[in-house]
């Protein structure tokens, strides 16, 4: 193979589709017999990619982006035993070895082993997190294949539902993890901050877990409409009424059992401050509306270094939080990236057995080509309600 057409980062809001070298079964001059090379079937644009696009999460120029990957095995190393050429697989966005203490304790989100970047406590494709090239490309290298990859047993069946299954590499497990972290269970009342793709997946996950009422708040009316059309409760955060009052109008009480932050550090304020970036906004609003003894899951990304912060403290990841309120209410919180391997198999079965028929409606997937990827990023940046799925080889045309 001569080359590999890919989405390449060249600076803030500057992405280019270029041909980079075809991947080899090696990384940083180290042979990887436990790796495979995939022909990418689908690869999605994520909200996390938008942090990079907007210059808020640093990656080096020339880096290939993308961490939501589904692909077909076209080459494998001699140590790969469970995957065969031609297998259709989903790739967790966490790069994890399956061998270290954290992986063995079901914490693949913070694998200790792949120490390419000594400053990172985790590995992921497409970020500057231990140097792994991204999957918004025609082909991609995946290490630790036997541990990492989820193989679809019935390839034809999986391709029929590929627009849903493409979500299990990241955002569906991420949203679901936020709900699990928040203790969502049958009968729960849930408030989700953010109606972007992760927030919508969190809403879908909360319903799958049996929540009685799922409320999603956002400033984007088009994204909120996707949720309301699927039967979820929504709150337009541009409304000047206090969030507690708006929740009270829905539930008859101003607090919920469980909260999910699906926004992260680029959050905005409420009401008159809806157009103002407020890094602590989502978290403080959750501290306010989650009941005493409740819990909050925080899959939204927060960073230790922001190149373009709204204030000095935010630039180093220090936020002004209502910690006293959270402590007094004894709210349990859990942060961090989702350990995708804990959830992807179960969520795949839920999709294949039609337990999430509302997923396609709320996600509003739009399939695009690799060449259209920079335009997809620009539309997403402007608030598009679509979830953009890149189809590098034209394999999703009739799906």
Swiss-Prot record:
Zn(2+) 2 binds at residues 97, 100, 103, 111. Its cofactor is Zn(2+); NAD(+); NADH. The keyword NAD applies. The gene is fdm. Active against a range of primary alcohols as well as some secondary alcohols. Exhibits higher activity against alcohols with longer carbon chains. It catalyses: 2 formaldehyde + H2O = methanol + formate + H(+). SUPFAM superfamilies: GroES-like, NAD(P)-binding Rossmann-fold domains. Binds 2 Zn(2+) ions per subunit. Binds 1 molecule of NAD(+) or NADH per subunit. This is Formaldehyde dismutase.
């Amino acid at each position: 193979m001569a080359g590999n057409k890919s989405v390449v980062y060249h600076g803030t809001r500057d992405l280019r589709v270029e041909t980079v070298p075809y991947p080899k079964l090696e990384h940083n001059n180290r042979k990887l017999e436990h790796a495979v090379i995939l022909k990418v079937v689908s690869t999605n644009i994520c909200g996390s990619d938008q942090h990079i696009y907007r210059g808020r999460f640093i990656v080096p120029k020339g880096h290939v982006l993308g961490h939501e990957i589904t692909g077909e095995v076209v080459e494998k190393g001699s140590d790969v035993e469970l995957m065969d050429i031609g297998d259709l697989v989903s790739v967790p966005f966490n790069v994890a070895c399956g061998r270290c203490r954290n992986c063995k304790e079901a914490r693949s989100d913070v694998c200790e082993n792949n120490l390419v970047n000594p400053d990172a406590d985790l590995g992921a494709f497409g970020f500057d997190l231990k140097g792994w090239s991204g999957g918004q490309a025609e082909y991609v290298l995946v290490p630790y294949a036997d541990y990492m990859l989820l193989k679809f047993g019935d390839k034809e069946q999986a391709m029929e539902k590929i627009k849903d299954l493409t979500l299990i590499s990241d955002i569906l497990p991420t949203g679901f993890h936020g709900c699990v972290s928040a203790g969502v269970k049958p009968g729960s009342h849930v408030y989700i901050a953010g109606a972007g793709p992760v927030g919508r997946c969190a809403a879908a996950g909360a319903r799958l877990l049996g929540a009685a009422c799922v409320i999603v708040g956002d400033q984007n009316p088009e994204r909120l409409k996707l949720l309301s059309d699927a039967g979820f409760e929504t709150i337009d955060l541009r409304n000047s009424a206090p969030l507690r009052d708006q929740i009270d109008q829905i539930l008859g009480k101003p607090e919920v059992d469980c909260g999910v932050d699906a926004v992260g550090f680029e959050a905005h304020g409420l009401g008159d401050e809806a157009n103002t970036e407020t890094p602590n906004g989502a978290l403080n609003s959750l501290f306010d509306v989650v009941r005493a003894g409740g819990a909050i899951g925080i899959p939204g990304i927060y960073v230790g270094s922001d190149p373009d912060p709204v204030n000095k403290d935010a630039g180093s990841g220090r936020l002004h939080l209502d910690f006293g309120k959270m402590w007094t209410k004894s709210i349990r919180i859990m942060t961090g990236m989702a350990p995708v391997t804990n959830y992807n198999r179960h969520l795949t079965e839920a999709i294949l057995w039609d337990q999430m028929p509302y997923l396609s409606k709320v996600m509003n997937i739009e399939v695009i080509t690799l060449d259209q990827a920079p335009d997809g990023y620009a539309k997403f940046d402007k608030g598009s309600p679509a979830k953009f799925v890149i189809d590098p080889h034209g394999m999703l045309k009739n799906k």
